[in-house]
Swiss-Prot record:
Organism of derivation: Mus musculus (Mouse)
Full protein name: DIS3-like exonuclease 1
InterPro entries: Dis3_CSD2 (IPR041505), NA-bd_OB-fold (IPR012340), RNase_II/R (IPR001900), RNase_II/R_CS (IPR022966), RNR_Ribonuclease (IPR050180), Rrp44_CSD1 (IPR033771), RRP44_S1 (IPR033770)
Region (Disordered): 306-332
Class in the EC hierarchy, top level: hydrolase
An annotated GO cellular component: cytoplasmic exosome (RNase complex)
Subcellular location: Cytoplasm
SMART domains for this protein: RNB (SM00955)
Domain RNB: 465-816
EC number annotated for this UniProt entry: 3.1.13.1
Top-level taxon in the UniProt lineage: Eukaryota
Single GO term (MF): RNA binding
Reaction(s) this enzyme catalyzes, per UniProt: Exonucleolytic cleavage in the 3'- to 5'-direction to yield nucleoside 5'-phosphates
Designated gene of the protein: Dis3l
């Protein structure tokens, strides 16, 4: 029977008054104890994760230990850990949401032997707070009382160790109850885990850092920064419009002096500002760190400053500032921090000389973070000399107003500086990517497929699914080496003469049950992480590379979308969704499919499924396959043409494939070449994603997971418009349709790279595409700007995207709505779905960053061991795509590299080019305008560099001990190194824009002809089916890396 208590809460209002709130608090005779020793498991309802049976004791940390030593408690070696509800709530209220979510994720993680015990809802454990009792004392008393009850509940069969930092509690409770021991956390590690050195080192580091904070708080220092305003003042200021809330973004090229606040939440609508707010200098930043949610006070207009237009020390991309410092922009200062974005940071210790120069107390060391945007961190350690050559992980503990730098503590060693595995580990830590192996509990949920016990289609599934194994020619088209084949395609002619197009996606949800251990793990990872030389899977390989991978010649479960199309206009007549059984006939690579599409049948020997056949059978199968690929391509052209009429964008990204040998040595860097078959596959995937989005929204209008791409801010197009103007083109950015048409017409027949770079600039101006719950925003906000679709989602890659798993469950619930009510019960509510979307969006950004950073790592490794002065491959043709006050930004097509090239060096010498084009450094000056920069020597010689000029550059590597190595570009001649862009010039006799216009006209004519029952123009149809030219289609997979046209449904390895 429930017992009712009254719980009194004292809350402070914005006006500073104390508000007394009384809430009902119900106590239960039993709550889940999650112990295998429970004498009444049915009464306790122990349905979730249980503690391990083989432990020698249970450990219960008090609230203070959970707050200060949570990262030690995360060690998987520490087993039998029971987190009391009282301790968890203390973390939530005193350490904020970030630390609390970290604790929640630890409790969910099947790899960690820890559970939550809701002691404040258990009638024998709950203790009311006594009058005048300090909160900290009540929390410790409550946790101890719960520990005693838990010991007796397990029938005194398992000793309990309560760890606390409260010396008074140790003295009071230490020997009060037999079987319940109360000791300090340090004492616990010394006695129970003496050989767990990493835990001891981390504990010592945290303890030392805490003691120093306490000592410093007692000392009087001058204030380095102003104090942050109280929370109630900040919230009232935001509400009144005096202050503005936003996310701090530090400019990595000028991390010491330049940061921007991107408006967040209501501030973005109420402030009236159309640009970011400049935060100039570290004082104005006021101890906020990149990614923090901050509150800003605007400065008077007379104090506004402008961005710097000069190249910084590590400029390497398009994100460098482009505005002149003479153009002031809204400027402010940080007055408070609403949410800290502190995380693990990879740092490097200073050299011996630097340590000596830091002062007499050598135990306090300033370490330099790998990320330029993070300030130096002061830590205390005696290992500085031993760790000078290593990358290590630290965490920030505090940043007081009296300290120039934040204080932190040492966590662990990653690896040696420059070592490949150490640098990869750095990228993973910097992006908060965990790559630990799947746990035993998770693997126990997996199906078995071994030679002794092969997996088979079950009779039940054969009855419930549509069987396509003998009726449909199903095949996949993927990159070479792809193992996780998410999608397959089919096309066939129906008895009524119409066509049937099918997209068949791996049925991952059949094997991954909602809220199972593997489902929780996949949700946490959210995506498969693809690096330049490896990948980290979201799902175990038994699923990702075997039973869910739609490999050739084996039976697989799929979720299919199949459309009936008009045989001439390809108009969709009807659509079917459902679960199927397929057997893929071919596992084609993109290159082989393109060769077949182009009529090169000699590629047959590279297709294993055809190679083993006799000539007659081979010819028949080949004709069937070629027809299917050709028909799919023709359908895809018409689908794309229809989207183009609505304003779909074809943008440009840079993707480089790292070619490795068997020993993982880098053989070459190869920019990915677009093929028309890429577009064919992508268009089919876009079609499936669009139709599934419509279906799940119709069925669940308030809790469907869709993907939106908001229109970009017009001011972000300024550089694109100016650059196009330099070549005589006008870019109309009023809508996606006008932008697409303008980019299609901005072609320089002498240099195709001009259009490529303009599209790349358009990509940089775009906002990010994001997942969202349909119950969280208005329908007019669902639109996908880049794809020109009113509703869009991700359905086609459930092996490597958790969003697709959610969408599959929604689709199954939609088509089974009246049949299986239990399916609906496993769907997320709007609130929970929106929280999940934020998590997935965050993990997607991490995946994109890590992929980009790993590619840059391998680019540097490729050039690092080469002599830039003599090696031919270190000299390349480059195109200037942006002008700065002291140099230019250059794109190198051969290697897909973008970077800065200085025209003025550190000695203030400027570049001078002779009649042959060769360069040298001389005294002089630079004069910059919008579209060109002139270098004039003291002797009067001048050289002009224009936008889109081709120059010869030397590629070398700028080594860095504390940060990642970077590519260094040096202009060695103002002449092209070779015929500009030879490799790309002759790719196609038809530009993509021309092809789409022709196909659009074909569709319109076919529709008109059908209306008047006229004759279809067969000549044009034949032209499109038989074209051998490669389109200039830019891979949608590339755009995924830029979080825009993210329809990539192929793997990167």
């Amino acid at each position: 029977m429930l017992q009712k208590r009254e719980k009194v809460l004292l809350l402070r209002t914005f006006q500073g008054r104390t508000l007394r709130i009384v809430r009902e608090h119900y106590l239960r005779p039993s709550v889940p104890c999650n112990s295998p020793l429970c004498p009444q498991p049915a009464a306790c309802r122990n349905d979730g994760k249980l503690l391990a049976a083989e432990v020698t004791h249970y450990v219960i940390p008090d609230w203070k230990v959970v707050q200060d030593y949570l990262e030690v408690l995360e060690f998987p070696e520490l087993k039998g850990v029971i987190f009391m509800q009282t301790a968890c709530q203390a973390v939530q209220h005193q350490r904020g949401r970030r630390q609390y979510n970290k604790l929640r994720n630890l409790l969910k993680d099947a790899r960690h032997d820890c559970v939550l015990f809701a002691n404040e809802f258990q009638q024998h454990c709950y203790l009311p707070r006594e009058k005048g009792e300090a909160m900290e004392k009540w929390q410790t008393r409550s946790i101890y009382n719960s520990a005693v009850w838990y010991y007796h509940h397990c029938e005194d069969r398992m000793p309990i160790v309560m760890v606390t930092e409260d010396e008074e509690a140790i003295q009071k409770y230490g020997s009060e109850t037999e079987g319940v021991f109360v000791i300090s956390f340090k004492n616990y590690l010394d006695n129970f885990w003496p050989d767990l050195k990493a835990a001891h080192d981390l504990c010592d580091s945290i303890l030392q850092s805490r003691r120093e904070r306490e000592t410093e708080s007692q000392e009087t220092h001058g204030k380095e920064y102003p104090e942050h305003l109280p929370l109630e003042v900040l919230e009232a200021g935001i509400k009144s419009g005096r202050y503005i809330q936003g996310i701090l973004n530090v400019n990595k090229h000028r991390a010491q002096i330049e940061a921007f606040v991107r408006l967040h939440g209501a501030s973005s609508k109420d402030s009236g500002l159309v640009s970011d707010i400049l935060i100039h200098g570290s004082k104005a930043r006021n101890r906020s760190i990149h990614g923090d949610v901050v509150v800003v006070e605007m400065l008077p207009k007379s104090e506004w400053k402008g961005r710097t237009a000069a190249l910084g020390e590590n400029d390497s991309d398009d994100k460098a500032s482009g505005e002149s410092p003479s153009e002031p922009m809204p400027t402010g200062r940080v007055v408070g921090i609403l949410q800290k974005n502190w995380r693990d940071y990879v740092v490097t210790f200073p050299s011996k000389e630097e340590v000596q120069s830091q002062g007499k107390n050598a135990q306090k060391i300033l370490v330099t973070p790998w990320d330029y945007r993070i300030p130096k961190i002061r830590i205390s350690t005696q290992q500085a000399e031993a760790l000078q050559d290593f990358r290590v992980v630290v965490r920030i503990d505090s940043w007081e107003a009296t300290s120039v730098y934040p204080n932190g503590h040492f966590v662990r060693v990653l690896g040696r500086i420059g070592d490949l595995e150490g640098e990869i580990a750095t990228i993973l830590v910097e992006n908060s990517i965990s790559v630990v192996p799947f746990s035993e509990a998770q693997m126990c949920e997996m199906p078995v497929n071994t030679p002794e016990n092969p997996w088979k289609v079950s009779p039940k599934e054969e009855q419930e699914r549509k069987d396509l194994r003998t009726t449909h020619l199903v095949f996949s088209i993927d990159p070479k080496g792809c193992e996780d084949v998410d999608d397959t395609l089919s096309v066939r002619t129906l008895n009524n003469g119409n066509l049937e197009l099918g997209v068949h996606i791996a049925d991952v949800t059949h094997f991954v049950a909602p809220n199972s251990y593997i489902d929780v793990e996949a949700r946490t990872r959210a995506t498969t992480y693809y690096l330049a030389d490896r990948r980290y899977d979201m799902l175990p390989s038994i699923l990702s590379a075997d039973l869910c991978s739609l490999l050739g010649g084996v039976d697989r479960y799929a979720v299919s979308v199949m459309w009936e199309l008009d045989k001439t206009s390809y108009e969709i007549k009807k659509v079917w969704y459902g679960r199927t059984i397929i057997r893929s006939a071919y596992k084609l690579f993109y290159e082989a499919a393109q060769e077949l599409l182009d009529g090169n049948f000699s590629i047959v020997d590279d297709i294993p499924e055809l190679k083993a056949l006799d000539k007659q059978s081979q010819q028949a199968k080949l004709e069937e396959l070629v027809w299917a690929i050709g028909k799919l391509t023709d359908i895809a052209r018409h689908i794309r043409a229809k989207r183009d009429r609505c304003g779909a964008l074809e943008l440009e990204g840079v993707e480089v494939r790292v070619q490795l040998d068997d020993k993982k040595n880098i053989r070459d860097l190869i920019p990915k070449q677009p093929l028309e078959v890429h577009e064919t596959v992508a268009e089919c995937m876009i079609l499936a994603n669009h139709w599934v989005a419509k279906k799940i929204w119709e069925s669940f209008p308030h809790q469907a997971l869709l993907r939106q791409h908001p229109p970009p801010h017009q001011e972000f197009f300024s550089e694109l418009r100016e650059c196009a103007k330099a070549k005589g083109f006008f870019i109309d950015t009023r809508s996606n349709k006008t932008l697409a048409d303008s980019l299609d017409s901005a072609n320089d027949p002498k240099d195709p790279l001009v259009n490529k770079l303009l599209r790349s600039m358009a990509t940089q101006a775009m906002s990010n595409a994001l997942y969202f719950s349909t119950g969280s925003c208005a329908e007019e906000e669902f639109h996908h700007y880049g794809l020109a679709l009113d509703k869009y989602t991700h359905f086609t890659s459930p092996i490597r995207r958790y969003s697709d798993i959610v969408v599959h469950r929604l689709l199954m619930a939609a088509i089974s709505k009246d049949k299986k009510m239990e399916i609906k019960e496993n769907l997320f509510s709007n609130k929970n779905l929106e929280e999940l979307c934020r998590h997935i969006n965050n993990r997607n950004r991490a995946a994109q960053r890590s992929q980009k950073q790993s590619t840059e790592l391998f680019q540097c490794m490729y050039f690092k061991d080469r002599d830039a002065e003599t090696e031919e491959r270190c000299i390349a043709d480059g195109v200037i795509y942006s002008i700065r006050t002291n140099g230019v930004l250059v794109f190198i097509p051969r290697f897909g590299i973008k970077g800065a090239a200085y025209l003025k060096n550190k000695d203030s010498l400027v570049i001078s080019c002779g009649p042959e084009g060769s360069s040298e450094w001389k005294p002089g000056s630079l004069q910059r305008s919008q579209n060109k920069i002139i270098s004039t020597t003291a002797g009067g010689q001048s050289v002009t560099f224009h936008l889109f000029d081709h120059v010869t550059v030397r590629i070398s590597v700028q080594a860095s001990r504390c940060h990642s190595d970077t590519i260094r570009l040096e202009i060695v001649s103002n002449k092209p190194y070779m015929i500009p862009n030879t490799e790309l010039c002759h790719q196609s006799s038809l530009l993509k824009s021309e092809l789409v216009k022709e196909v659009t006209r074909s569709v319109e004519e076919a529709q008109l002809a059908q209306e008047v029952k006229g004759k279809v123009i067969q000549e044009e149809h034949q032209e499109y089916c038989q074209t051998k030219g490669r389109s200039l289609y830019t891979l949608l997979e590339e755009i995924r890396d830029l979080a825009l046209l993210d329809v990539s449904d192929s793997c990167a390895m």
